Curated annotation (Swiss-Prot):
Protein name: Metallothionein-2
Biological processes annotated in GO: cellular response to cadmium ion; cellular response to copper ion; cellular response to zinc ion; detoxification of copper ion; intracellular zinc ion homeostasis; negative regulation of growth
Binding site for a divalent metal cation 5: 34, 36-37, 50
Keywords of the record: Acetylation, Cadmium, Metal-binding, Metal-thiolate cluster, Zinc
Modified residues (N-acetylmethionine): 1
Organism per entry: Macaca fascicularis
Domain statement: Class I metallothioneins contain 2 metal-binding domains: four divalent ions are chelated within cluster A of the alpha domain and are coordinated via cysteinyl thiolate bridges to 11 cysteine ligands. Cluster B, the corresponding region within the beta domain, can ligate three divalent ions to 9 cysteines.
Region of interest: Beta: 1-29
Stated role: Metallothioneins have a high content of cysteine residues that bind various heavy metals; these proteins are transcriptionally regulated by both heavy metals and glucocorticoids.
Similarity comment: Belongs to the metallothionein superfamily. Type 1 family.
Length: 61
């Protein structure tokens, strides 16, 4: 298990709707804990495969 993630390595992450991009620290998971980051957003992806509209993610601006 990734110490930065509540899920088992390779499994889907689960995160509350209030999750912020900066809290997305999963490195061993295939899916993101956060849905506010677009794919390829290096600032908040931090190893996660983030998805969503970039206009919903102020840390990517």
């Amino acid at each position: 298990m990734d110490p930065n993630c509540s899920c088992v390595a390779g499994d889907s992450c689960t995160c509350a709707g209030s999750c912020k991009c900066k809290e997305c620290k999963c490195t061993s998971c295939k899916k993101s804990c956060c849905s506010c980051c677009p794919v390829g957003c290096a600032k908040c992806a931090q190893g996660c495969i983030c998805k969503g509209a970039s206009d919903k993610c102020n840390c990517c601006a």
